[in-house]
A protein has these predicted regions:
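Conserved P-loop NTPase-based nucleic-acid remodeling module centered on helicase motor cores
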Residues: 1-20, 33
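Short glycine-/polar-rich loops that comprise or flank the Walker A/P-loop
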Residues: 114-117, 123-125, 146-151, 189-193, ...
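Short alpha-helix plus adjacent loop in nuclease-associated cores
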Residues: 126-130, 159, 252-275
């Protein structure tokens, strides 16, 4: 990666994406020249992939995908070994079959021959791991591969109240690529499902806090409550709210700290420099965001001075103009509130243009980066001075560290999780958050198959609840109008007229 001289700020997301893409290429046995990366330029991805494969071979290492791939190649190239393993297993049972990928399925088919004594169990409505290569159509086409197969549909839900099961049926029946089945509940009756709209995200989070208190009065412990989001970043402000009201919680995913995001670090560096900080490290973060064409060679001391920069570029008037403009902007910044400063950095200094360029380079939507700026501005809105805001950041970061220690030892409190991480679990009370277009379905889901997967994800969230279920969405966020999720309107859970009013 570093030999490619990439400028990557969101390293964690970038490397996670790379690992997933390398896995997709191997599992799908996709010719490298026919794979188009969603993370970086295609030539760059191919170079990284080839270097990764070469390093694994020279180091005599196998990753999980290699184990599958080499197993398949061994079984297809060595009939003697294949026959030995076929004789060893008279019957094969595969659980969670909806999550199988093509390579795994091909291995299973080889092992099952010649008797084909296969017993598969799965729920096609819970296939939610396409990003790992899972293909629900494998399960759907199983009777075509094995025409003598018998199919048993298990449509009874023993977990959830009938009110919840009926709603889940309305949602998932909109998917066309599934086994048709009428879901019904073993437990009849139950509490009505609450579908609630809020003016903004803050009201949504405060509502959850109040409902949690009501549930406690009804004798439902924190451990029987779950708050579910489409993405981990969605929980940022709820976490802050719960800590503020001292409500215990446990994150199944990484605790989100907005202030550790690279965009937040850039903004903080701008403000620190405006307040008089002159370290080379801080200056390097922001000097070319947006691009001012400053060279690292101009920063030859541990401390940066504007006079030193002017001396370095004394024969380039246009560069001196850029230095003057930056100094002028920093002088303007230091007289602002944190909220005003963040917006000035974004619009006045031109940081938004840098984010647009970076988004294009990384093949991501610029709106994802703008959202971080908007959340950062919102977090700073109540503070009158930079010092007060920095104290809040420090205290919040410390609280998160303490929360992480608690989680490692206790695992107590309300469960906060993404929909992907909650599969297989169940709770008395579940809150499904931010059921808006762009969040659920996620804005990256544009094809029919990806929309169906998002609907399955929503279905998984709904069916985590035993007794109580809340489906919540906001009308506005960061001064932008939001649209209720199509999953609520198409199934008649929210009237279309109500959706149209929001447009």
């Amino acid at each position: 990666v570093y030999r490619q001289k990439l400028t990557i700020e969101d390293e964690k997301e970038f490397f996670q994406g790379l690992v997933q893409e390398i896995s997709m290429v191997k599992n799908g046995r996709i010719p490298l020249e026919h794979y188009y990366s969603a993370n970086c330029p295609d030539d760059t991805f191919r170079a990284i992939y080839q270097a990764y494969v070469k390093r694994c071979k020279t180091s005599k290492l196998l990753d999980f995908d290699d184990i599958l791939l080499y197993t398949y190649e061994l079984l297809t190239n060595r009939n003697d070994i294949l026959r030995g393993w076929q004789k060893r297993f008279s019957y094969i049972l595969v659980d969670e079959f909806q999550d199988i990928n093509q390579l795994q399925y091909d291995v299973v088919k080889l092992l099952a021959k010649p008797e084909d004594n296969l017993f598969i169990v799965g729920d096609d409505d819970q296939s939610i791991y396409a990003f790992r290569g899972a293909k629900p159509e494998i399960m759907l086409h199983f009777p075509e591969d094995y025409p003598d197969a018998k199919t048993e549909l298990l449509a009874c839900n023993y977990r959830s109240a009938s009110t919840i099961v009926e709603l889940s049926q309305k949602v998932i029946s909109e998917n066309s690529r599934r086994y048709k089945k009428e879901l019904f509940a073993d437990r009849m009756g139950g509490n009505p499902v609450t579908i609630q709209a809020f003016e903004d995200g803050k009201q949504e989070e405060l509502y959850v806090k109040n409902q949690v208190k009501e549930l406690l009065k009804k004798g439902i412990p924190y451990e029987e409550m779950a708050v579910l989001y489409r993405t981990n970043s969605g929980a940022r402000f709820l976490v802050e709210t719960l800590m503020q009201y001292q409500i215990p919680f446990c994150m199944r995913d990484t605790l989100p700290n907005l202030y550790e995001h690279w965009i937040a670090q850039d903004v903080i560096s701008y403000i620190r420099i405006a307040m008089g900080e002159r370290s080379r490290r801080e200056f390097l973060r922001i000097m070319n965001r947006p691009n001012r064409y400053f060279s690292r060679d101009a920063l030859d001391d541990a401390q940066v001075s504007f006079e030193g920069l002017r001396w370095f570029y004394e024969e380039k008037d246009w560069m001196c103009d850029r230095i003057d403009k930056l100094e002028e902007d920093l002088n303007t910044l230091k007289r602002m509130t944190p909220y005003g400063a963040i917006n000035y950095i974004r619009y006045g200094i031109g940081y938004e243009e840098y984010l647009k360029e970076y988004a294009g380079y990384r093949k991501i939507k610029a709106e994802e980066l703008f959202e971080v700026m908007e959340e950062l501005a919102l977090s700073a809105k109540g503070f009158k001075s930079f010092s007060d805001w920095f104290v809040h950041i420090e205290e919040y970061t410390q609280q998160l560290k303490e929360q992480a220690k608690k989680q490692a030892s206790e695992k107590k409190g309300i469960t906060i999780s993404t929909l992907h991480s909650i599969k297989g679990l169940e709770f008395d009370a579940v809150f499904l958050m931010d059921v808006n277009e762009g969040s659920l379905p996620y804005h990256k889901a544009v094809t029919e198959s990806s929309i169906e997967e998002e609907r399955r994800l929503f279905y998984v969230g709904i069916t985590r609840a035993r007794k109580f279920l809340w489906i919540l969405y906001a009308k506005n966020r960061h001064d932008k109008e939001l649209e209720v999720s199509r999953f609520l309107t198409e199934s008649g859970l929210v009237l279309k007229e109500e959706k149209d009013k929001k447009k």
